[in-house]
């Protein structure tokens, strides 16, 4: 059998290796998605796929190997106080509960060292995460677990969560074994019990209502910091077109690499 024929054997495909096929079979038996954290079994992009574009006509090269490479990224440039990152990468939202206190604070320290931001994730703010983060997103989610307007005003940017790439349209689910007393206190819910976030926000029904909600958040933050919409990658063209009409400062299209809780 040739190499070309062999790559189409069951379980040897790059897109559908054995782990992916087993996952499909398990979900077909269950009739629903699996209750698990972490990423997909499917092959996904890695850090090795990041590419710096070289100069040609649009970025004319003066002298080889001496050109500056600028990685500064500005989120919400039209906001009175835009969020400036030294690199086009930041630590996305992962809740306290899905991650431990040690992990959250370590990521905050690392993000500060790299000149970039971290995000609270759902469930509210850990004071030490905010203290160690020089640049910090506060995430507003469907369930409003842990939401505190005073913490909102401490943020450098607000991330209004509509969906995430690994489970578009499914809301959130934090397993009971991760709901410690501290997590439960932050979310005003009982410890040791599974906690679910609904798939949609309860106080707006569409893009027009969402625009009003964004104005409400903008008023709460004195109109100073950027407001970002987080969308799971689905009908990207249509979703972005509608999101752009809501008056948000930036739009974040989330891939399927995540899935912490």
Regions found by a protein language model. Give the residues of each.
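Conserved, well-structured core domains of diverse proteins
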Residues: 1-89, 93, 98-112, 116-117, ...
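Short linear interaction motifs
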Residues: 140-142
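Hydrophobic/aromatic residues located in beta-strands of well-ordered beta-sheets
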Residues: 118, 136-138, 227
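Alpha/beta enzyme core
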Residues: 109, 130-132, 144-261
């Amino acid at each position: 059998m040739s190499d070309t024929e062999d790559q189409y054997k069951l379980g040897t495909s790059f897109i559908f290796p054995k782990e992916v096929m087993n996952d499909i079979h398990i979900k077909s038996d269950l009739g629903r998605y699996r209750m698990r954290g972490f990423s997909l079994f499917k092959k996904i992009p890695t850090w090795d796929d990041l590419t710096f574009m070289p100069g040609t006509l649009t970025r004319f090269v003066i002298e080889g190997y001496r050109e500056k490479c600028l990685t500064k990224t500005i989120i919400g440039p039209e906001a009175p106080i835009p969020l400036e990152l030294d690199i086009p990468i930041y630590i996305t939202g992962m809740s306290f509960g899905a991650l431990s206190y040690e992990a959250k604070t370590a990521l905050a320290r690392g993000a500060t060292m790299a000149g970039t931001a971290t995000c609270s994730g759902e469930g509210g703010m850990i004071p030490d995460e905010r203290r160690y983060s020089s640049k910090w997103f506060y995430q507003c989610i469907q369930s409003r677990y842990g939401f505190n307007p005073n913490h909102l005003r401490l943020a450098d940017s607000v991330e209004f969560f509509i969906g995430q790439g690994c489970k578009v349209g499914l809301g959130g689910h934090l397993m009971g074994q991760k709901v410690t007393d501290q997590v439960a206190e932050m979310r005003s819910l009982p410890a040791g019990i599974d906690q679910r976030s609904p798939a949609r926000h309860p106080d707006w029904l569409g893009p027009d209502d969402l625009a009003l909600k964004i104005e409400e958040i903008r008023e709460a933050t004195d109109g100073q910091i950027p407001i970002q919409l987080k969308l799971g990658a689905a009908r990207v063209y249509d979703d972005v077109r509608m999101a752009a009409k809501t008056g948000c400062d930036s739009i974040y299209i989330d891939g399927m690499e995540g899935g912490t809780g």
